[in-house]
């Protein structure tokens, strides 16, 4: 991996140096995991948007959905990360990396990657959902001295489903979900009939009505976006949204949930 080149690419997009370094570490983490466990995982979530869909929103979560009956242990995954990330962190001038574990629920685990008491990012291991079986694309990566791998990622459409459900089901509305929905729709992501049926099921099972959806969309306002998006977006990107009073985010949500409003 050409570290200087990768850092420059992220900085040119508007990421700070610190966040560019985290993105490079997450790239290396994905390469290491898919090289050592080529059939075990699918990459999902916000990091996928940053790495493969040009999202400018900082995401410090590397979400891995595992396939099959048994995933590699969290210890095996952490050992893989330690071997590949430690030399890279040293080049970036970071102190020794530390890895902490957290079990969240049955068949799930979380690995925190820390340096000098600061959390850099985390790796979530979660069971693959049936809604996205077959919705996977491959990205060959040449890691130069670290070998090569084919990184398998969920496609844009199920990522849109994930964000659509997250926006409605979280206890409190998150502006980052609205931003991700807007980004994915700009990237021409859509809900296929199968994915739309899954969203319909989620809405019905959770007894979400049109008024509730409209209320949540209305909460994407200046105050919430200032608190949640300003810290994680490049200044120029945030300024454009602010100048439009964040209407593009609300409009994307209205279009997404149109038939339920």
Q: What role is predicted for each listed range?
A:
Residues 46:
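Active-site glycine-centered loops adjacent to acidic/histidine catalytic or metal-binding residues
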Residues 1-42, 52-62, 67-261:
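Structured mid-to-C-terminal alpha-helical surface segments
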